[in-house]
């Protein structure tokens, strides 16, 4: 079938098209069958993989269960496995030369020993192993008992008629130690003779000597606690006398150890021991107070130094010793219950009380603890025993507790009881005999002297340590400075060597290391100098400076305040009160429908009001809804009162229901008025905004007469900015509004400047033209889409009518192709002449004006005329030729225009050739259709195509 269109002869072979369509359908069917087969194969493969995976997982789980059962039955399995792994790793490390031979053999022996032990342990798990083990143990025990019996029998036979010393000589001879044991045995003989002279046996003597240190400790403790000397002599002296068989024997034993040498050594050792004990006591008294303050969060609000000053102040006017006073202070501070004032009052009273009556400080403090727990009840209980309160004092303490807090009440109650007992203890002290007063003064003097010795001893020890440490630091400083000098010398030598030609990299690593040593030495020297300054500052203050520093350290940054403790107590009371109320309410059983009934009644009331809606914009206020809820609650409670017990809150609500409803109605009326007023205010705001907008619109309308559309739009935008700003609460004269208007005018000025720039407009137009011409993807896409759609329409027309008109299709496709090529040639020509970039179909680029300069004429059937800068006429074929010579090499898939010598032109679009010939026989459209479908199939099956992606998805590739 041949049609002539605008002088062009087009030949279409319909049978070829039909064969192509049939081949395409057969291929599509075969492709679908292949895809189905491939999908089935993939599914079966996936099922097989899943089953294999499940089988492997089941085997792994069974193996794990077996190992767990084996380990549960035989606990040696895991240990032997670990030893096996360790042995393999040891062999590997030994073969690599990491483990020395000696270590390897030693560890190997240990592994063998461990394996043997585990093997025996495994054998013990069976009945045969247990029986063999028991039999071996029985044989071993029998042999040991036999040997022990014979040794004991021989010893008894050899001891007949011999003294203890002779038996020791015999035993030493058996062991081969006669020479070494001879001096010791001689001392035993001397001791035996002394015992015979004293009239007691060796056993009694050993027992007496064993008990002597404990008896001496009891004597010292009794004297330190204030017990009279005569009582100590009666109690402890009699025990010591009886232990050694009388007074004479006792002094004989003691005198036997005294000689000029032992006496001097004893005095020296005793003096050092006394000083050490005194220093330790001083250190412990300070640290105990500090630790007590830290453990209690510093609730007392003082430092250790302040508490120590309190102790010294009390000791000046008290009959008690400074040591006992410090113990009382420490115990009170560690309790965390008392403030500084309370500690001072309790300590003073307790010290006098204990010194006058001999009662322990802990017992006295326990009396004050009754006040700390509850001041009113505590005073009442103490008064039952000590009879010290007067009428009205308990009421005063209770008033303090309610008005100023628990802490203030405890302080006042403590002071009241402490003052009374202090006066009574002073009366007891005044009535003491002269001997008792003298003994009390001696004890106090001894305690004060002991404290002074302890403080100075502790300070002197710290001073000596600092002096020695300072000397060591000075030596370290000299060494650090020497390291710095040596490293500097080495570094300077390396730098001098590096300055020589070709030696710039010499010793770079060593130089860096030496520089690090210099820096480290300087830092170390500075730190040592700082430490030395601190030591010198401490040494200048003398030995007592260390004691003062110890008492001042560890001051807490934040003290636990009385207000915090009082707040915590009140918080605990409130929680306890709420819990009691909650427990009381939890006993009331409410019906599960009460809450639903209450909500239902409230919703019905709200619905009724909404149904009676008569005014525009009428709304329910929150207060009105609350009224409905209150009325519903009261109605439900009335009904529930006959079915269950009401809580106190519910009873109170029913008792005052009329008043409650009246107040709720008043709130509802006010709430409705507020809602209505809010609506009126909103309407007022909307009205004002509308008036402002219309006023601005009217002014803008009047001002825009005679203006262009663009100026009118600008006036409207400026008016809207002003109106929106005023409606938001601003005023017309605000600086912010003027800034907004200025910014908008600046934008208009920039827009006008752009409109006046004709060169930029030309450049923009050329750039847009170039973007459209060089958009090969979009242009070819459009051509291909038009071609496919046109072919589809043509095929439909042919199949339905038996006729096909190729005229419009050919016009459109050929026109689009020629337009695309012409646009690119024009753009490349102009761009090349202007020194810009030129582009090819394949996306390549070249610069300069080579496209125009390399154009050569080529015979063509048609010539398109275009206007260039020189006015020369250039044919389209010549332009296309110049493009080809300057890098526009079209690929097989790119559109191509080929001019034949015969005058015909063939346009190739994606492999489909359309031959345009005036008067010659056409090749037909069948070849183009066939090539087009082949290309579509090839692209679908190649990498990235639809068929390829489908197969990859199914196979998991």
Curated annotation (Swiss-Prot):
Subcellular location: Virion
Coiled coil: 42-72
InterPro entries listed in its UniProt record: GpH_LAMBDA, Phage_tape_meas_C, Phage_tape_measure_N
Keywords, alphabetical: Coiled coil, Viral genome ejection through host cell envelope, Viral long flexible tail ejection system, Viral penetration into host cytoplasm, Viral release from host cell, Viral tail assembly, Viral tail protein, Virion, Virus entry into host cell
Pfam families: Tape_meas_lam_C (PF09718), TMP_2 (PF06791)
Chief place of localization: virion
The protein's assembly and partners: Interacts with the tail initiator complex presumably through its C-terminus domain. Interacts with the tail assembly proteins.
Cited function: Serves as a ruler that controls the length of tail by stopping the tail tube polymerization and is probably released from the tail shaft during infection to facilitate DNA translocation into the host cell. Assembles into a multimeric linear form probably arranged as a coil of alpha-helices and stabilized by the covering tail assembly proteins. Its C-terminus fixes the tail tip complex, thereby forming the tail assembly initiator complex. Tail tube proteins polymerize around the tape measure protein, displacing the tail assembly proteins.
NCBIfam families registered for this protein in UniProt: tape_meas_lam_C
Family in the record: Belongs to the Lambdavirus tape measure protein family.
Protein name: Tape measure protein
């Amino acid at each position: 079938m041949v049609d002539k269109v605008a002088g062009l002869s087009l030949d279409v072979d319909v049978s070829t098209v039909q064969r192509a369509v049939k081949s395409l359908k057969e291929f599509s069917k075969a492709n679908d069958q292949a895809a189905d087969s491939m999908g089935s194969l993939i599914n079966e493969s996936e099922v097989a993989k899943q089953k294999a995976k499940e089988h492997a997982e089941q085997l792994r789980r069974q193996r794990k269960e077996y190992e767990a059962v084996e380990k549960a039955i035989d606990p040696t399995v895991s240990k032997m496995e670990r030893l096996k792994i360790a042995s393999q790793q040891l062999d590997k490390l030994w073969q690599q030369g990491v483990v020395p031979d000696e270590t390897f053999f030693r560890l190997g022996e240990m592994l063998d020993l461990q394996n043997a032990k585990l093997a025996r342990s495994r054998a013990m798990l069976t009945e045969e192993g247990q029986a063999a083990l028991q039999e071996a143990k029985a044989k071993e025990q029998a042999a040991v008992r036999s040997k022990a019996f014979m040794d004991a029998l021989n010893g008894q036979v050899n001891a007949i008629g011999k003294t203890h010393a002779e038996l020791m000589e015999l035993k030493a001879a058996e062991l081969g130690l006669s020479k070494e044991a001879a001096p010791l045995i001689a001392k035993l003989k001397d001791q035996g003779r002394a015992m015979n002279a004293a009239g007691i046996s060796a056993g009694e003597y050993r027992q007496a000597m064993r008990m002597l240190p404990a008896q001496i400790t009891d004597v010292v403790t009794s004297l330190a606690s204030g017990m009279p000397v005569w009582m100590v002599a009666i109690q402890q002296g009699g025990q010591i006398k009886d232990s050694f068989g009388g007074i004479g024997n006792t002094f004989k034993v003691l005198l036997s150890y005294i000689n000029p040498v032992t006496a001097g050594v004893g005095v020296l050792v005793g003096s050092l021991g006394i000083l050490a004990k005194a220093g330790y006591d001083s250190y412990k008294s300070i640290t105990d107070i500090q630790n007590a303050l830290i453990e209690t969060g510093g609730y007392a609000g003082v430092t250790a130094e302040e508490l120590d000053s309190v102790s010294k102040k009390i000791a000046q006017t008290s009959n008690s010793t400074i040591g006992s006073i410090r113990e009382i202070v420490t115990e009170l501070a560690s309790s965390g219950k008392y403030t500084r004032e309370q500690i001072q009052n309790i300590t003073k009273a307790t010290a006098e009380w204990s010194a006058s009556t001999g009662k322990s400080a802990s017992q006295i403090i326990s009396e004050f603890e009754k006040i700390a727990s509850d001041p009113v009840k505590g005073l009442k209980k103490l008064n039952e025993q000590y009879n010290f309160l007067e009428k009205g004092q308990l009421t005063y303490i209770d008033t303090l507790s309610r008005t100023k807090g628990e802490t203030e009440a405890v302080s006042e109650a403590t002071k009241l009881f402490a003052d009374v007992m202090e006066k009574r203890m002073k009366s007891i002290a005044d009535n003491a005999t002269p001997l008792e007063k003298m003994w009390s003064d001696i004890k106090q003097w001894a305690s004060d002297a002991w404290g002074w010795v302890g403080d100075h001893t502790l300070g002197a020890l710290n001073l000596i340590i600092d002096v020695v440490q300072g000397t060591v630091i000075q030596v370290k400083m000299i060494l650090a400075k020497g390291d710095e000098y040596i490293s500097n010398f080495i570094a300077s030598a390396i730098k001098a060597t590096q300055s020589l030609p070709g030696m710039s990299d010499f010793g770079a690593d060593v130089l860096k290391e030496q520089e690090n040593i210099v820096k480290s030495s300087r830092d170390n020297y500075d730190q040592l100098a700082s430490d030395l300054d601190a030591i010198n500052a401490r040494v200048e203050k003398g030995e007592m400076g260390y004691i003062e520093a110890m008492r001042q350290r560890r001051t807490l940054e934040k003290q636990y305040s009385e207000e915090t403790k009082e707040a915590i107590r009140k918080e605990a009371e409130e929680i306890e009160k709420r819990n009691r109320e909650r427990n009381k309410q939890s006993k009331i059983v409410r019906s599960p429908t009460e809450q639903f009934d209450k909500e239902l009644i409230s919703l019905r009331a709200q619905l009724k009001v909404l149904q009676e809606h008569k005014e525009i914009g009428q709304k329910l206020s929150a207060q009105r809804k609350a009224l409905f809820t209150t009325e519903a609650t009261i109605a439900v409670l009335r009904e529930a009162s006959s079915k269950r017990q009401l809580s106190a809150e519910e009873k109170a609500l029913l008792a005052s229901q009329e008043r409650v409803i009246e107040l709720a109605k008043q709130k509802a009326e006010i709430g409705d008025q507020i809602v209505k007023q809010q609506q009126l205010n909103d309407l007022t705001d909307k009205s004002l905004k509308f008036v402002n907008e219309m006023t601005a619109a009217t002014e803008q309308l009047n001002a825009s007469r005679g203006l262009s559309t663009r100026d009118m739009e600008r006036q409207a935008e400026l008016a809207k900015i002003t109106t929106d700003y005023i409606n938001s609460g601003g005023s017309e004269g605000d600086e912010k509004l003027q800034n907004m208007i200025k910014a908008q005018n600046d934008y208009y000025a920039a827009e006008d400047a752009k409109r006046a720039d004709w060169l930029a407009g030309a450049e923009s137009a050329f750039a847009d033209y170039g973007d459209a011409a060089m958009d090969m993807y979009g242009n070819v896409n459009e051509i291909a889409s038009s071609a496919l759609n046109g072919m589809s329409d043509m095929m439909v027309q042919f199949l339905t009518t038996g006729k096909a008109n190729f005229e419009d299709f050919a016009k459109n496709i050929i026109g689009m192709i020629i337009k695309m090529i012409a646009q690119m040639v024009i753009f490349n020509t102009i761009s090349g002449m202007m020194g810009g970039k030129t582009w090819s179909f394949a996306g390549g680029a070249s610069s300069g004006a080579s496209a125009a300069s390399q154009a050569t004429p080529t015979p063509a059937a048609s010539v398109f005329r275009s206007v260039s800068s020189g006015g020369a006429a250039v044919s389209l074929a010549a332009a296309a030729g110049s493009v080809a010579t300057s890098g526009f090499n079209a690929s097989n898939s790119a559109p191509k225009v080929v001019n034949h010598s015969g005058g015909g032109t063939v346009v190739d679009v994606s492999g489909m050739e359309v031959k345009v010939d005036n008067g010659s026989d056409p090749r037909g459209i069948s070849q183009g259709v066939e090539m087009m479908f082949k290309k579509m199939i090839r692209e679908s099956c190649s990498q990235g195509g639809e068929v390829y992606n489908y197969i990859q998805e199914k196979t998991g590739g």
